[in-house]
Amino acid sequence: MTLSWFHKLVPSKIRTEASTKSTVPEGLWCKCPSCNAILYKSEVERNLEVCPKCSHHMRISARKRLHLFLDPGNRLEIGEGLAPLDPLKFKDSKKYKDRLQQAQKATGEKDALIVVAGQLLGLPVVAGAFNFEFMGGSMGSVVGERFVRGVNHSLEHGAPFVVFSASGGARMQESLLSLFQMAKTSAALGRLSKARIPFISVLTDPTMGGVSASFAMLGDINIAEPGALIGFAGPRVIEQTVREKLPEGFQRSEFLLEHGAVDMIVDRRDLRERIAALLALMTRDGRAVAPAAAKAPPAIGEGAGEADLARCLSALPMDDPEAE
């Protein structure tokens, strides 16, 4: 049945205007997953992917993280040519090889960790960041090798090492090869500690499994972003195992700070200055830090001891382990 009678009644001009597509481009707006506010995308980006309404810290890619953290220019990517293999020919519901190709196509990266040597407010550093969009930021052999090469670069140049973790844990598709990386990365940090080169671990949402059980909690200073999920097994798994209801906010960074599992919580917008100030104290090189960041950072939360930590670090003779 045709609608010719309708076309006779409705002028063509009206029909044309009604069918005209909207000229508003896509991607102008986004929704905060915490407060559900509809936000202007460019405003969120200017705010470093932090919700301007509720200060929820959204997840960001590894490259964007490093772009925001390091000074522009003079950057060297470490282990860029490394790519994962499939020696076990692993297959679950999908072949591991196919999962890798899918993740690489979606993210444009070869694996989940990017390590870059650069500067932070003029202070030489080596920084690594996980991309959670790449197979949940899982740690496989390439992630472990890039991490160790980053440590080696720090040892060679005497530069502090900073890592932003965002991972679901060890990569099951690499089986024992992925579990080896827990020991491999931890042993590398032992060499860094012996050389008295600072390692700062920044735990972002989420940091779980084999990553939290290895290098992520081995920082000389462990920093968490607000509201980050941090732990080994997920809260639902724990509740099913112990058959008890977990406390409110269990495994969130605020809960961990209250119970001494992390040293401080720092807003993403303050991370550059805060970490630079701490590294200046730990390396005795305050000249490398901008004047605004050279002073001891303020305390956070209710009675948190970050200012006390900064004063202790500045007063402690770094070569005298017996000093109090």
UniProtKB/Swiss-Prot annotation:
According to the entry, what is the taxonomic lineage of the organism?
Answer: Bacteria, Pseudomonadati, Pseudomonadota, Gammaproteobacteria, Methylococcales
Where can this protein be found? Cytoplasm
Q: Do you know which Pfam families this protein is assigned to?
A: Carboxyl_trans (PF01039), Zn_ribbon_ACC (PF17848)
All disulfide bonds of the chain are: none
Originating species = Methylococcus capsulatus (strain ATCC 33009 / NCIMB 11132 / Bath)
Q: How is the cofactor bound?
A: Binds 1 zinc ion per subunit.
Q: What does the annotation say about its assembly with partners?
A: Acetyl-CoA carboxylase is a heterohexamer composed of biotin carboxyl carrier protein (AccB), biotin carboxylase (AccC) and two subunits each of ACCase subunit alpha (AccA) and ACCase subunit beta (AccD).
The record ties this protein, via InterPro entries, to: AcCoA_carboxyl_beta, Acetyl_CoA_COase_Trfase_b_su, ClpP/crotonase-like_dom_sf, COA_CT_N, Znf-ACC
ZnF bounds (C4-type): 32-54
- Keyword Kinase found: no
Q: What keywords were assigned to this record?
A: ATP-binding, Cytoplasm, Fatty acid biosynthesis, Fatty acid metabolism, Lipid biosynthesis, Lipid metabolism, Metal-binding, Nucleotide-binding, Transferase, Zinc, Zinc-finger
Q: Which reaction does it catalyse?
A: N(6)-carboxybiotinyl-L-lysyl-[protein] + acetyl-CoA = N(6)-biotinyl-L-lysyl-[protein] + malonyl-CoA
For activity, the cofactor(s) needed are: Zn(2+)
Q: Which residues bind Zn(2+)?
A: 32, 35, 51, 54
Protein name in UniProt: Acetyl-coenzyme A carboxylase carboxyl transferase subunit beta
Q: Which NCBIfam families match?
A: accD
Q: Which GO terms describe its biological process?
A: fatty acid biosynthetic process; malonyl-CoA biosynthetic process
Answer yes or no on keyword Metal-binding. Answer: yes
Family indicated by similarity = Belongs to the AccD/PCCB family.
Enzyme class, top EC level, equals transferase
